Amino acid sequence: MKYFNRRGFLKTAGAAAGVFYIAPTSWAQKSPGDTLNSVVVGFNGRGQSHISALSGLKDSGVRLTALCDVDDAVLRKGVDAQDKKGVKVTPYTDIRKVLENKDIDIVSIATPNHWHSLGAIWAVQAGKDVYVEKPVSHNVWEGRQLVNAARKYKKIVQTGTQSRASRSGIGEAVKFVQSGQLGKVIAVHGTCYKPRGTIGKVDAAQPIPAGIDFDLWCGPAPKDEIRRKRLHYDWHWIWNYGNGDLGNQGIHQMDIARWFLGEMELSPRVWSVGGRLGYVDDGETPNTQIVYHDYAKAPLIFEVRGLPSGKGSKDMDNFHGSKVGVVVRCEGGHITVPSYTSSTAYDKSGKEIKKWTETKGGGEAPHFKNFVEAVRSRKHEELYADILEGHLSSALCHTGNISHRLGQTAATGVIREQIKGDREATATVDRMIEHLKANEVNLDSVKLTLGPVLKMNPKTEKFIGNADADKQLTRDYRKPFIVPEIA
């Protein structure tokens, strides 16, 4: 089947037994001036930034009172670090014990991806307001349940896409584009050209590192043997726990790209092409990938490149000057967003015509401050990155990955034939092929994976006519770590 003719498209365009739950009658709302007690759950990586941000909000009445991690060494190190600062925090290994503490008001979640939605839903059900790292979900369905939970229990849930705090550096550029000052949008490109080397390859199951509660680490995911050298971080590249770089670094740029388009639904059609190329290791997710979201307004095209600009190089490619960023191509020029806090507009000749920088600093600190202000006001509309925004951007990553996982290997000639009806897709694929050739990847012997075009009903967030794709919108949860359906 032909992948599409874009012109033609535009013409037609309650919880199970054993599940942890705290009844909402067991909590009460604090007064606006009260101290807000906070906990960070999972801090072997991004959680360190959560600790710093919350600790910096003392003047806003926020107090870090607890830390939670399933790794005893990480937990002890975190508690000791706070102790040296004169801050006494209560250590927890199990998030369920955290949520039983009625004195905790804010739960900040930076666990591996497979825990994000469940931990946040449990926290909301326990009466807590939540800051949850991106992606807010491991799959589409559980992300929607988190949105439903936030609304049902009237809790404030902020997504950790801190670029949304850049109101002058990026937000004003969004307004500039949406007001039509550069003409019609042709395409929005997200790029994640970030070095990702091999994670190595083991020939036997690895021992569980000492001090880790592995049952809790796995949580809702299968409790499988460890088949990689490093338990921590490299879970990003294993489907049961992570979502590849599309759902790791890429979710930030996917979110900015959707922000520019102003889309508040999932795309009606999506497809993917790519693979894990350039080395053989224990990773499962693509290190080279294109995801094409076929919105009626303009396509959102996302690229992941983990290999360098060429074999042996230490540099990465760039697209219109963007390595990890966003490029908005319009009839009258283009805008680049090369960072979390700035944007630049160019005319058709490439001359810079306008530049935006963040006047309030941007990033983590103002994003957390905005979260706390919304906790005080009880208005989720005041959030920079309300959970609905986080769900939609996360789900765009998930649907792209679903196409990849349902794909089949194909020769480059076949791929080019399938997409020849679309100039943007063809140009993007051609650039990816040249990139792989520069890395001496022999595409005659190592084939790319071409995913199917998946049609979606954005209202129901289910695919049309593809039962196999629908199955991947959720997962089989491991008891008792079951994500509840929230009506």
Where do the model's predicted regions map?
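Structural recognition of the beta-strand scaffold that forms the well-ordered cores
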Residues: 37-41, 45, 64-69, 108-110, ...
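Non-transmembrane alpha-helical segments in soluble domains
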Residues: 10, 51, 55, 79, ...
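A contiguous active-site-proximal alpha/beta segment in oxidoreductase catalytic domains
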Residues: 129, 137-216
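Contiguous beta-strand/loop segments that form the cofactor/metal-binding neighborhood of enzyme cores
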Residues: 172, 184, 189-190, 198-244, ...
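N-terminal glycine-/serine-/threonine-rich beta1-alpha1-beta2 phosphate-ribose binding loop
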Residues: 1-132, 141-157
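Conserved donor sugar-nucleotide recognition element shared by glycan-biosynthetic enzymes
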Residues: 47, 91, 116, 142, ...
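Short, solvent-exposed turn/loop segments enriched in Gly/Ser/Thr/Pro and often Arg
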Residues: 71-74, 92, 110-116, 136-138, ...
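Alpha-helix capping and helix-loop boundary segments enriched in small/acidic/polar residues
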Residues: 74, 86, 110-114, 137-141, ...
